[in-house]
Amino acid sequence: KIMFHYRWDLEVDQQYSSRQIISDNTPGLRGTALAKAARAIRDRQVGRMPLVGCTPQNKPIIEQSFHTLLNILDSFVTRDEYLFGTRPALADFGLFGQLKTLASDHTPMLIMRNNVPSVYDWVRRLEDSSGIEGEWHSLAQMRTAVTDLLRYCATYYLPFLRANAAAIAHGQTNLSVELAGQTFEQPVFKYQAKCYARLKSLFAEVDAPPLRTVLSDCDCLPYLE
């Protein structure tokens, strides 16, 4: 939601993103044809914003969640390189997937460069992190950033996933949920309900009491059981 919001909220980002998408996917287009195609993708994506919760009403919570995430990562990357050891994990690359786009789109790029340049640099380095060997941290060595990110999930995302799944289960077309003390509303999203069910089913297969303790301490456990 953060990436989609920043990509299509402001005029300057709409113009940049639509042209970039068309230029990347259809590099042979030029002039009027390029402008026409860019306008079409722009209109389509802007029109989809309410479907994914990117509305003026939700804008404060979405932008707050972005700055909160950046602050967590900023306190981390000034001391460590990877979340779970001296080698990258799927978690690092998962964050990279979204942050790479945010680090190249106009407005979020400026936010990252001006406010958290260390995070901007970290994202850039992650792009060339394949093949790095290293060691995994033990549970006792878990970095504060990991628990901070889990609490972040328990504040901004897991409540949304549960509310979305519950709304679908009750045949509702819209959901409303409190995230970090603010009301967030959007139409239900079936794919995310599928993702939530998969996440819970995978967790049910794990027999790891120490993991349950960490998740409980970070307020994630109630959303996964």
Q: What are these language model-derived features?
A:
Residues 61-68, 78, 97:
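A conserved active-site cap/scaffold subdomain adjacent to cofactor or substrate pockets
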Residues 1-64:
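Internal, well-ordered alpha/beta segment that forms a basic, Gly-enriched binding/recognition surface
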Residues 83-103:
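GST superfamily/GST-like fold recognition
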Residues 182-225:
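C-terminal non-catalytic accessory extensions
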Residues 75-85, 132, 205, 209:
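Surface-exposed helix-capping loop/turn segments at secondary-structure junctions
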Residues 52-57, 79-84, 105-110:
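Inter-helical turn/loop segments and adjacent helix faces that build the functional surface
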Residues 98-132:
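Short His-centered aromatic/hydrophobic patch
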Residues 138-158:
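Small-residue-rich helix-loop
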